């Protein structure tokens, strides 16, 4: 039964990811000037696509950084469950109040980190930017647990390549993360080929320009994703089976993945492999 449920979850995540990429492409077309091109017609098409992921596992938001408010949201009511009535600010305060106690510093740490790291990125490198967050745990007001994975990307920028609009995609990966994992991590990739990185892991709180997984670990994980077994991986990379096992364990521990299947999925979602 557990295996069936896990497969269903992975299929749902893959479906959401595919729709996300379609939405991203459409969004770049819609938000291609100071104003929104054919706003009403295009937003209806965008909303139709977004409804493909409507449910309790994911939601998408197009955020306006000029007004500091969502331009469009789909799936957020199902995702967060029942919330008290109020304006956008009150709702955000309520949602942050749902953070599990181990993550109460997340809003402050992540904003401080992101602000500092963004200032370090040269103008010419501010392209193809993607921001991933993973591992933050919330408990809904009805008691249901949520573990967040989010992907954000700018879909319109100003002359200095500061964000005007971003597309933010949030999933509940509660079933992909180990129950005893009490950390979160963030990864920014950017550049023509996504070759530049900034990362942060709450376990050590180190600001880094290295990836969360090493080059060797990613080599191993790519082979795992291609269904190579431990012995085949060891032979392919001229290392021992024990070394393969150690790297696998270290990757699972670092990302908080529940198992190897979840590890591969998380790495693909962040484009580490």
What residues fall within each predicted segment?
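Intrinsically disordered, low-complexity terminal regulatory regions
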Residues: 1-67
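Basic, Lys/Arg-enriched C-terminal extension of HTH/homeodomain DNA-binding domains
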Residues: 2, 252-273
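Juxtadomain coupling helices with adjacent low-complexity linkers
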Residues: 23, 173-201
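PAS-family sensory domain signal
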Residues: 38-94, 189-196, 200
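Sensory/regulatory domains in signal-transduction proteins
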Residues: 63-85, 90-179, 183
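Regulatory hinge/linker segments at domain boundaries
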Residues: 193-216
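Short alpha-helical "packing" element that flanks the helix-turn-helix/winged-helix DNA-binding module
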Residues: 217-224
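Recognition helix of helix-turn-helix DNA-binding domains
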Residues: 227-262
């Amino acid at each position: 039964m557990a295996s069936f449920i896990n497969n269903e979850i992975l299929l749902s995540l893959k479906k959401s990811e595919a729709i996300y990429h379609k939405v991203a492409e459409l969004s770049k077309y819609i938000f291609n000037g100071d104003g929104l091109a054919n706003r009403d017609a295009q937003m209806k098409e965008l909303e139709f696509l977004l409804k493909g992921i409507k449910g309790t596992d994911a939601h998408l938001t197009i955020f306006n950084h000029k007004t500091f408010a969502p331009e469009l949201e789909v799936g957020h009511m199902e995702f967060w469950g029942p919330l008290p009535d109020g304006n956008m600010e009150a709702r955000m305060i309520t949602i942050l109040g749902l953070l599990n106690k181990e993550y109460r510093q997340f809003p402050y740490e992540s904003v401080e980190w992101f602000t500092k790291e963004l200032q370090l990125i040269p103008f010419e490198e501010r392209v193809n930017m993607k921001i991933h967050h993973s591992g933050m745990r919330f408990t809904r007001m009805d008691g249901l647990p949520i573990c967040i994975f989010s992907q954000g990307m700018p879909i319109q920028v100003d002359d200095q390549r500061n964000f005007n609009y971003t597309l933010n995609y949030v999933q509940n990966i509660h079933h992909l993360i180990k129950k005893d994992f009490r950390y979160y991590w963030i990864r920014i990739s950017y550049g023509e080929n996504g070759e530049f990185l900034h990362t942060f892991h709450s376990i050590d709180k180190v600001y880094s320009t290295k990836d969360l997984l090493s080059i060797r670990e990613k080599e191993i994980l790519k082979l795992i994703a291609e269904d190579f077994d431990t012995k085949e991986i060891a032979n392919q990379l001229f290392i021992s089976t024990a070394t393969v096992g150690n790297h696998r364990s270290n990757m699972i521990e670092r990302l908080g993945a529940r198992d190897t299947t979840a590890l591969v999925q998380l790495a693909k979602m962040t484009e580490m492999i």
